[in-house]
A protein has these predicted regions:
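Acetyl-CoA-dependent GNAT
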Residues: 4-11, 15-73, 78
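Conserved GNAT acetyl-CoA-binding A-motif
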Residues: 96, 103-115
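Conserved beta-strand-loop-alpha-helix junction that forms the acyl-donor binding cleft
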Residues: 113-122, 141-144
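Conserved acetyl-CoA binding element of GNAT-fold acetyltransferases
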Residues: 73-84, 138
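Conserved acetyl-CoA-binding loop of GNAT-fold acetyltransferases
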Residues: 127-136
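Hydrophobic adenine-recognition pocket in adenosine-nucleotide-binding enzymes
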Residues: 5, 80-82, 115, 131
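Conserved acetyl-CoA-binding loop-helix of GNAT-fold acetyltransferases
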Residues: 82, 88-101, 124, 128
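Short hydrophobic/aromatic beta-strand or adjacent loop that forms the aromatic wall/cage
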Residues: 43-46, 135-139
Length: 145
């Protein structure tokens, strides 16, 4: 079942990030980010999916508004993850469908995402639900301490 993510979900979100995305995240940072991002509904769309028995978050999609000089308004998916114990049950597809419904209802022209080259299962999933790979690129980052 869909629901909003809140600070009490930080442990589950951190665990999903670790086991599904291979991101080692600090629970306290996840709490801060949940509080910050869920209060910015004009820029961040965060949809959680809970286990109906335990009421715990087992998946989520997080997207941010994307607009530039060269594109119409779109959504950039920053994260889509489902606890591996629940993968293969249509939860990722339901989350994406919910996000797509949001996009259509809000006159958003496209949804885009980046996916690491090694995540071939994810690539197959996205292609299966109608997404196409339109370019391969490198990511550059500069970290400030």
């Amino acid at each position: 079942m869909f629901r909003e993510i809140n600070i009490e979900d930080a442990q589950e979100v951190a665990e999903i990030c670790k086991v599904a995305l291979d991101y080692d995240v600090d629970v306290e940072n996840v709490k801060r980010q949940i509080e910050k991002l869920t209060n910015d509904k004009k820029q961040h769309i965060i949809i959680g999916y809970e286990d109906e028995n335990t009421r715990k978050i087992i998946g989520f999609v997080h997207a941010q508004m994307y607009e530039s000089f060269y594109s119409d308004l779109g959504l950039n998916i920053l994260g889509l993850a489902v606890n591996p114990d629940f993968q293969g049950k249509g939860i990722g597809k339901k989350l994406m469908n919910k996000l797509e419904d949001y996009a259509v209802d809000n006159n958003i022209s496209f949804i885009r995402l980046n996916s690491a080259m090694k995540r071939e299962d994810a690539h197959n999933f996205y292609e299966h639900i109608g997404y196409t790979c339109d370019k391969v690129q490198k990511r550059f980052i500069k970290v400030f301490e």
